[in-house]
Amino acid sequence: LLCAVSLIQAQAYKGKGDIKGQVGANLQDHGTGIFFSGDYGVGENMSFGFTTNYLLNTTEIEGEKADFGDRFDLKARFNANLGNVFKLDKKMDVYPGLDLGLRNFGAHLGFRYFFTDGFGIFSEAGLPIAKYDEDVYGFDHYNNQFVFNIGASFNL
């Protein structure tokens, strides 16, 4: 049994064919919510995926509450999984990337650490590079500003 346990190694990114799922908290100015993402490895250091989040708690603006469209976001993304490039422990991965969403074209930087082969934690920060609307005001700032995500990561 001891030999079998020692052969199990947690690995944050395995390369082509690797599938990751993440769920966590989304934190941004005047709003907090839930974050989901999925990534699929297409090469040794590349993955494509999606993210979505929904703000559960938002600040009223001029007495109005944010509606579903203000609270929801969906993005397609590309990651460069660089843990092995930086010679990090196999349990760790650093992944900068680009994303194209409902509100902007942006960039993100994330970090994963796996405790077991199936479970780990992640943190990720993102910001818009180009907003689709130059006159952003009120609820348009939601999901269109600096965001921070933190939570659990899973090998699927």
Language-model segments: which ranges?
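Solvent-exposed loop/turn segments connecting transmembrane beta-strands
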Residues: Q22-I34, A66-F68, G97-H108, V136-Q145
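Gram-negative (and chloroplast) outer-membrane scaffold detector with strong preference
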Residues: D39-D117, F154
